Amino acid sequence: MTAFETESESAAVPVDAAAYREAMSRLASAVHLITTDGPGGRAGFTASAVCSVSDAPPTLLVCINRASSAYAALTQNGTLCVNTLGEGHETVASLFGGRTPVDERFAAGTWRRLPSGAPALTDALVSFDCRIVGRHAVGSHDVLYCAVEAVAASGQADALLYSERRYRTLPRAPRSGSAPAEPARAARALGARPAEGPALALRSA
């Protein structure tokens, strides 16, 4: 048997779901609140499975588990807002990521209504007002294709990331001519121990 045949046979073995989830936990991802409001009701959830599809026309991809409490409202309303989170949003991210009642989730932030009717977090790094234009079922999830109809960038915080089941922060890149981030701050962003002082306690979602 050749090496090529051995590799092909190995690749045909199904990947264990737990092993796949563990591997995916090592990917650092931006953290977003996906929110909606309309005839189907108000709802929202925390997501990291968000990415750009195209800039012409501007389109985002959002994945949602069909077992999510937000699924019915989101698909019935047909609109949503992608709110990208920054440092300081760990609490609201955890609330939207658990089994917290809807009213308590939205009570944790300050919101404004977008033209689509979706709620936008006022201090999000950026909010994308979207209309769902396509949907495709894959396994337990639906992949939503979302046409971006408006963008609002307002927050100035460092980016919030999720990696190894913990929230972490990524400092904003310094502007041209400005000093780089101090070592202690850079260490906190990486979840490492700063040169001086205690290590930052990173909370799991």
UniProtKB/Swiss-Prot annotation:
The keyword Nucleotide-binding does not apply. Keywords: Flavoprotein, FMN, NAD, Oxidoreductase. It comes from the Bacteria. GO terms for molecular function: FMN binding; FMN reductase (NADH) activity; FMN reductase [NAD(P)H] activity; riboflavin reductase (NADPH) activity. Residues 171-205 are annotated as: Disordered. One of its GO terms (biological process) is uracil catabolic process. InterPro entries: Flavin_Rdtase-like_dom (IPR002563), NADH-dep_flavin_reductase (IPR050268), RutF (IPR019917), Split_barrel_FMN-bd (IPR012349). Its EC number is 1.5.1.42. SUPFAM superfamilies: FMN-binding split barrel. It catalyses: FMNH2 + NAD(+) = FMN + NADH + 2 H(+). Catalyzes the reduction of FMN to FMNH2 which is used to reduce pyrimidine by RutA via the Rut pathway. Belongs to the non-flavoprotein flavin reductase family. RutF subfamily. This is FMN reductase (NADH) RutF.
